[in-house]
């Protein structure tokens, strides 16, 4: 998505050779008008697919999933929770995922009420780095005996293993921007 690449170059910043910060428009402050363009693009990429629910992981994926939902007939948005919560049902699907950004492993959970057998689920998230979050969500979908339509990623770090890992697991991956490298403050796209 050319407009996304241009926005990253214009408004993003880098830290080291592996961190791309897009907090000015995607995951801290949100440019809702631009997020609508992202939602439209995901609809185009997954055109013709039946999507019953949009699935993500807290927290940065929630805003993206909510906008994307509007382009899939307002499909409900479900997000896996990383933290313990007194108001989360005890009857949950659960798996462990490693977060590249936080450099730690999380137990993520989703209530069995919200992912159901036979449903067609589209995963969306802001970043793909090592692919563990997406594979964790895929595991939750499989536990529920639901169907994974695919994974929609706003920004894939192509220099990390996530994309290859998802493809090796027969996951349809649609990344709107793939960063080939971050070198000396310069972002290069695939």
Swiss-Prot record:
SUPFAM superfamilies: PRTase-like. The keyword Glycosyltransferase applies. GO terms for cellular component: cytoplasm. The lineage of its organism: Bacteria, Bacillati, Bacillota, Clostridia, Peptostreptococcales. This is Xanthine phosphoribosyltransferase. The gene is xpt. One of its GO terms (molecular function) is xanthine phosphoribosyltransferase activity. InterPro entries: PRibTrfase_dom (IPR000836), PRTase-like (IPR029057), Pur/Pyrimidine_PRTase (IPR050118), Xanthine_PRibTrfase (IPR010079). It comes from Clostridioides difficile (strain 630). It catalyses: XMP + diphosphate = xanthine + 5-phospho-alpha-D-ribose 1-diphosphate. Pfam families: Pribosyltran.
